[in-house]
Amino acid sequence: MTDDELPKTVFDDLFSVIESRRETLPDDSYTASLFAHEKGENAALEKLGEEATETILAAKDSDSAAIQAESADLIYHLFVVLAMEEITLDDLREELHGRL
């Protein structure tokens, strides 16, 4: 798939799916399992830390494919934590825009 074919809304689409899983908690969903985990938010925070470390290690090794894959995992788990805290992508956009 070329860059021109990729949807520009992929982050919004992903965040929507995460929010939907938070609301419906389907049994077969990894995302829902993070929201329903017995350790609560700590489970998602641990995964976020793990993915951050894996991203750093991939960058240290200059492994482009691993950097891409680990960054996707990092963003996904960050979005889960944002959803847990009821922080929207618009909130994040506003924060980033204020830093320009």
UniProtKB/Swiss-Prot annotation:
Stored InterPro entries: HisE, PRib-ATP_PPHydrolase-like
GO terms under cellular component: cytoplasm
GO BP annotation list: L-histidine biosynthetic process
Pathway: Amino-acid biosynthesis; L-histidine biosynthesis; L-histidine from 5-phospho-alpha-D-ribose 1-diphosphate: step 2/9
Localization in the cell: Cytoplasm
Known catalytic reactions: 1-(5-phospho-beta-D-ribosyl)-ATP + H2O = 1-(5-phospho-beta-D-ribosyl)-5'-AMP + diphosphate + H(+)
UniProt keyword list: Amino-acid biosynthesis, ATP-binding, Cytoplasm, Histidine biosynthesis, Hydrolase, Nucleotide-binding
Disulfide bonds: none
GO molecular function: ATP binding; phosphoribosyl-ATP diphosphatase activity
EC number(s) per entry: 3.6.1.31
Family in the record: Belongs to the PRA-PH family.
Protein name: Phosphoribosyl-ATP pyrophosphatase
